[in-house]
């Protein structure tokens, strides 16, 4: 799988107590044989307009793959725990497959585990995680009713951006998790999550305020909670994005 080069758009590193600045990566799967288009359809005229639509290859094409044979989220987590497809396995304390409801209406996707997540094996448990929990509760969604995960399932060294091969190794796990949960809406947190999920080079700013599609599922893009810790003025636009997701859930 070929992944395009990293962009230079400034961003913030998730998963850190005092997140340093970094470049938001253009970390996307090759669009072939999947397909990205701009033909998504807005479900309601009072919601933002359509954005990208990405449809990775059908799972039927990979039926012999152990990941596709995983029948439950626990099965996927077991495969992740045994994964050695990239060098991230060499420095991890724990894999972080994700957690939450197996029948969640909302799937939340971040970039990758930070130090606390690596230590605990759970996603979004540091300061950024506390903020995410509050955001979800503000739209009457207890954390336990949501499925929360990341693009990569192991912590990159020094909380650096995930590299191309690392994302490519982890995307099949994410795809299978989404297939099993069958959410009504996906919330992508930060540029890496949005670009990787939608297979696009577009910046985070250009992806906001649109309703994208991943295999037909509406995708809303917003800032990563770690970015909000350093840039409180982004909280208002983030809240606007989250309310779009809430309206889609209620639609």
Regions found by a protein language model. Give the residues of each.
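A polyanion-binding, active-site-adjacent surface
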Residues: 1-251
């Amino acid at each position: 799988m070929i992944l395009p080069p990293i962009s230079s758009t400034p961003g913030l590193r998730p998963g850190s107590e005092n997140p340093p600045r970094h470049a938001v990566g253009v970390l996307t799967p090759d669009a072939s044989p999947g397909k990205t288009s701009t033909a998504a359809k807005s479900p309601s005229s009072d919601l933002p307009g359509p954005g990208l639509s990405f449809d990775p290859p059908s799972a039927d094409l990979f039926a012999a793959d152990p990941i596709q044979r995983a029948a439950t989220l626990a099965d996927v987590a077991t495969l992740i725990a045994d994964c050695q497809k990239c060098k991230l396995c060499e420095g991890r304390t724990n894999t972080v497959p994700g957690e939450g409801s197996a029948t969640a209406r909302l799937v939340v996707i971040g970039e990758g585990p930070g130090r606390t997540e690596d230590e605990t094996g759970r996603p979004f448990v540091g300061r950024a995680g506390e903020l995410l929990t509050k955001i979800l509760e503000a739209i009457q969604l207890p954390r336990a009713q949501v499925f929360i995960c990341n693009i990569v399932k192991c912590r990159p060294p020094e909380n650096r951006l995930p590299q191309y091969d690392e994302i490519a190794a982890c995307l099949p796990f994410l795809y299978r998790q989404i297939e099993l949960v069958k959410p009504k809406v996906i919330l992508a947190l930060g540029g890496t999550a949005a670009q990787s999920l939608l297979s696009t080079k577009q910046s985070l700013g250009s992806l906001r305020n649109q309703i994208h599609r991943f295999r037909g599922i509406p995708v809303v893009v917003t800032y990563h909670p770690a970015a909000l810790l350093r840039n409180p003025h982004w909280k208002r636009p983030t809240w606007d994005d989250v309310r779009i997701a809430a309206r889609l859930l209620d639609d």
